[in-house]
Structure formats: structure tokens, C-alpha cells
Amino acid sequence: MDVNIAPLRAWDDFFPGSDRFARPDFRDISKWNNRVVSNLLYYQTNYLVVAAMMISIVGFLSPFNMILGGIVVVLVFTGFVWAAHNKDVLRRMKKRYPTTFVMVVMLASYFLISMFGGVMVFVFGITFPLLLMFIHASLRLRNLKNKLENKMEGIGLKRTPMGIVLDALEQQEEGINRLTDYISKVKE
């Protein structure tokens, strides 16, 4: 199946008034995780544009350290994903504790970059856009169009870059399992 780039959402949809933002329910982690994953899929192009602008600004100010930081993060992330698919202990950790898995990748990247002296460039150029994406995805309430787009992605009618990344982190598999369970119950 071809990979489709999600459309750029309008600014007033991406960042509407305060009535479309709410604090997540920290007691219900699965609901919070569902909101984050749904928003990451729906607003992925907006997140990419914001991250590209921030990375470009930091990259303009310190190009060598920014390129070095990007290479280290990609290599560490690829190494952890490869290890998680080949080592059962890491695979279970990634499945049960996805936030911990991402934090370990970021910490490993931090320590590798600190050896090269580009820690601040890494922190502001790479992790700050990721932090902003996570905060927005956590606080932004979903709308009906968001939910519909996510169902299409979940059942495989659409394939997007963020969907591929979330599949690599095994964050969409649970939603697909719930959807197939629901469909089988409806058929009975």
C-alpha cells in the first residue's frame, strides 16, 4: 500500500481556542495514550512543519552540531527498534512501557551527543519539538474528523509516515485488535 502524506490542517483547527484543549485524565493511561496517538496521526503534517521550522532555526545557528545530533538520534532509534524486534526482553519492554522506551532512546542519544559537546543543540533542536508535539497531542481534544481519519489509518485504508513510526513503536496494534474484536462481535 502506498504511503500518503496527511494534509496540512488549518491553523484554527490545529490551534483553536482554549475550549478545544483539556488536561488529560492521568488516571486512565490508555485513554490518554489513545488521544496522543490519534492526534499524532491527525496533525502529523502540522507537527512536521513546526518541527522543521524549529530544527531549521537551530540548524542555522549551529549546523554541525545539529547534523551530528540528528545522525546520533536516528542511529540510536534504529538500533533500539532493531534490538527490540530481535530481543524478546526489549520487545516486551517496548510494548508495555512505550514512554520508557522512547525516554531510553532519548537518554542514550543525549549521552552519545554529550561526548561530542552538542548537548544543548540536541536538547533544543531535536527534543524540544518532540516535547511540544507530545504536549499538544496530550492536550488537544479530538473532533469527529480526527476520529474518522484515525479509523481509516487503523484498518489500513490509509498509510501515513506517522502511522509507520507508530507501528514501529507498536502503538497502533492495540487499536487494530480492538477494532477487529468489535467487528467480529458485530458479525455474531
Swiss-Prot record:
Belongs to the PRA1 family. Residues 1-35, 78-93, 136-188 are cytoplasmic. The keyword Iron does not apply. Regulates intracellular concentrations of taurine and glutamate. Negatively modulates SLC1A1/EAAC1 glutamate transport activity by decreasing its affinity for glutamate in a PKC activity-dependent manner. Plays a role in the retention of SLC1A1/EAAC1 in the endoplasmic reticulum. The keyword Transmembrane applies. PANTHER family: PRA1 FAMILY PROTEIN 3, PRA1 PROTEIN. It comes from Homo sapiens. GO terms for biological process: cellular response to oxidative stress; glutathione metabolic process; intrinsic apoptotic signaling pathway in response to oxidative stress; L-glutamate import across plasma membrane; L-glutamate transmembrane transport; learning or memory; negative regulation of L-glutamate import across plasma membrane; negative regulation of mitochondrial membrane potential. The chain crosses the membrane at residues 36-56, 57-77, 94-114, 115-135. It comes from the Eukaryota. The gene is ARL6IP5. This is PRA1 family protein 3.
